[in-house]
Regions:
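Short, structured segments at the rim of ligand-binding sites
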Residues: 1-240
Length: 240
């Protein structure tokens, strides 16, 4: 018997446990901070459908929010996105559960918020950078506090190049919303930073060129094609 203490409670952990149980494993406690595994069983094959990517869903919700768009997200699990949905509501973004999925829309300017990242079921650290893009064009002062990872505000410098007013103080970022951002050449420094730059580019005036997009491709499958399908002017090109 193995007991994993201080275990992550994220939906992805529960999904992995579900998969292993389907293969014959004896696992209990997933979704809590203590997981118990009874070893010694021979595992067998299984067919398993992986849960939808809640961070990709959250990123598209943020895309609708920053552009003032109206999109329908299919195949998502609302219970995995509760903290994101709650913060979007504070931002003046409407989410509505419909038979086909979740509809996301905004009328009027984004509102500023106070946000603190936490392990699940708190606000996900992977949505911190996309929300910084939202707050950069909100009306008023927002504060984001990062409690999960160190040095996770690297994207702030690239957003500043687009005209964002962001000040970093240790684990907190203070964002004064501006009317508009301006397109320029920026660099994706990591996966979620790259997503944040795409969001800001969608809302910015003029053209934005994002380099080092291999970071983005690590976590978003054909994001340019999906955004084009929603009406975005975005194209991938080789730069030599």
């Amino acid at each position: 018997c193995t007991v994993i203490e201080n275990a992550a409670e994220e939906p992805e952990i529960c999904d992995l446990a579900d998969f292993l149980r389907e293969m014959g494993a004896d696992i209990t406690g997933d979704g809590t901070d203590a997981i118990t595994i009874m070893g010694g069983k021979e595992l067998h094959g299984a067919v398993h459908e992986v849960i939808p990517d809640r961070i990709e869903a959250g990123t598209f919700m943020a895309a609708a929010a920053i552009t003032g768009g109206n999109i329908l997200l299919e195949n998502i699990r609302e219970e995995h996105l509760k903290p994101v949905i709650a913060k979007l509501a504070e931002c003046n973004v409407k989410t509505e559960a419909v038979p086909e999925g979740l509809r996301v829309s905004r009328k009027g300017r984004l509102h500023p918020i106070q946000l603190k990242t936490m392990p699940f079921p708190g606000f996900p650290t992977d949505m911190q950078a996309p929300f910084m893009s939202l707050m950069a064009v909100a009306k008023g002062t927002s504060v984001i506090t990062e409690t999960v990872f160190e040095n996770r505000f690297i994207h702030a410098g690239e957003l500043q190049r687009m005209g964002a007013d962001i000040k970093i103080d240790s684990r907190s970022a203070v964002i004064e919303g501006v009317e508009t951002l301006t397109g320029t050449k920026v660099k994706a420094t990591d996966l979620r930073a790259g997503a944040a730059l795409i969001l800001s580019a969608l809302a910015a005036k003029g053209e934005t060129e994002i380099s080092d997009i291999y970071h983005i491709e690590r976590g978003y499958y054909k994001i340019d094609e999906k955004l084009r399908a929603l009406g975005a002017e975005i194209e991938r090109k080789d730069v030599h």
